[in-house]
Regions:
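Serine-hydrolase-like catalytic core of hydrolytic proteins
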Residues: 1-163, 215-222, 226-236, 352-353
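Short, hydrophobic/aromatic alpha-helical segments in well-folded domains
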Residues: 45-46, 117, 211-212, 275-276, ...
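Substrate-access "cap/lid" subdomains that shape
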Residues: 128, 133, 137-243, 260-264, ...
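Short Gly/aromatic-enriched secondary-structure transition segments
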Residues: 238-251, 362-365
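Short glycine/proline-rich turn/loop motifs
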Residues: 1, 68-73, 251-259, 320-330
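Mobile gating loops/cap/lid regions near enzyme active sites that modulate substrate access
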Residues: 234, 278-371
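A generic "alpha-helical surface" signal
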Residues: 79-83, 267, 332-339
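Short, hydrophobic/amphipathic alpha-helical packing segments
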Residues: 85-93, 269-277, 342-349
Length: 371
């Protein structure tokens, strides 16, 4: 059950971490959901498997959507949800040692919007002391680097107009109805897939023109591990009604779909992720890269967006009904490959990761590989 009572975090640690004298590395998870859904405490995001590897785990929940990310004249500033995340990280710095964690070894990791949040925290003003490493899984950097300001202004003006029509306080349900209207309005804009989210050029974030410089500065302070799934764009290509109408054409429909998934995957995710990795290395920073390229036999989504998450968080019970895992082999692969992926993520958090580039697949054997 999700609701707007969302300003909290959860700490997961072993008894040994809580009672032993040695402080453990900390991993902080930021969830995805396009900044409109999700929460750190969902069962599917349980970090027990990682905590069992000698880590103290923290899951953050924060304001989303209209409540957290839309600047509205005279009513709400931008980036409130980002400030929620910053406050949570400040709490971790001040308190995690009492729970067995080392505040000087904090690794952020997140997927999709969560990865985008981490990218924003990397370039935000005055946040670099709050964490030391970052894992960006499927960050939508192609959308992030679009100029979203025109859309933000239009949505903010519409929200202001709707709210100004009455002086009566609005219920959360009424605000969520307004949010749905704003999401529909956002579809008119090129960056409408991220209608809400941190806004560049609004405190504490730099304008778009300064992002490259901020990344160079971050490279001197924060170790990076970035990656993507091979077919990130599969669900997003299907969201476009016009495109989807071509996918059922006889003989060529499947080819059109494959081509569109290839294009969307690269424009929204892969090109931006690879560019960030390369820019980091050129700036003298430490960056590692992975590609997740497994999918179950009965899933036409193939190696889709979010598919790596069940291998890191939650249990088979939490993920069994997910369409992206349809296939008789999924449970066995989830348990075997998931063990290796958790080991890899934990090794990065501990500063013990040796691989530079990792292909995560089911049965192929090329490059530096986990299978």
């Amino acid at each position: 059950m999700q609701d707007e009572d969302c300003l909290h975090l959860t700490v997961t640690a072993s008894v040994e971490a809580l009672t032993g004298g040695k402080k453990r590395p900390v991993m902080v998870f930021l969830h995805g959901g396009a900044y409109v859904s999700g929460g750190g405490d969902l069962d599917a995001y349980s970090p027990v498997g990682l905590a069992q590897r000698g880590l103290v785990m923290v899951n953050i929940t924060h304001r989303l959507g209209l409540f957290g990310y839309l600047p509205i004249h005279d009513r709400a500033p931008a980036n409130l949800g980002l400030y929620d995340q910053i406050m949570a990280l400040e709490w971790i710095q001040g308190n995690i040692a009492d729970l067995g964690g080392d505040p000087n070894r904090v690794t952020l990791f997140g997927e999709s919007a969560g990865a985008d949040s981490i990218f924003c925290l990397m370039i935000a003003e005055g946040t670099q002391h709050l964490f030391h490493q970052a894992i960006l899984q499927s960050a939508p950097l192609g959308v992030r680097m679009m100029d979203r300001e025109q859309m933000i202004q239009a949505l903010g003006a519409l929200a202001h107009h709707r709210l100004a029509s009455s002086e009566a306080p609005r219920t959360s349900d009424e605000m969520l109805s307004l949010q749905v209207e704003l999401l529909m309005e956002a579809k008119k804009h090129p960056s409408g897939l991220m209608a809400f989210g941190p806004s560049l050029g609004h405190a504490p974030l730099p304008p778009l023109s300064e992002v490259s410089h901020k990344v160079q500065l971050a490279a001197k302070q924060i170790n990076l591990f970035v990656g993507y799934t091979t077919h990130e764009g599969a669900p997003f290509a299907r969201m476009n009604d016009t495109l989807r109408s071509y996918f059922d054409l006889p003989l060529i429909g499947w080819l059109i779909e494959r081509l569109m998934v290839w294009i969307v995957s690269r424009k929204m995710f892969i090109w931006g992720i690879v560019q960030l990795h390369s820019r980091y290395l050129r700036a003298g920073g430490s960056s590692r890269k992975y590609r997740f390229d497994w999918w179950p036999s009965q899933s036409d989504l193939r190696s889709t967006h979010c598919l790596e998450l069940p291998f890191l968080l939650g249990t088979w019970t939490d993920w069994a009904k997910a369409p992206m895992l349809h296939g008789p082999e999924s449970r066995v692969v989830l348990e075997s490959l998931g063990t290796k992926m958790k080991d890899l993520w934990a090794a990065f958090a501990k500063g013990l990761m040796k691989l530079e580039n990792v292909n995560i697949v089911g049965d192929e054997t090329y490059g530096e590989i986990i299978s």
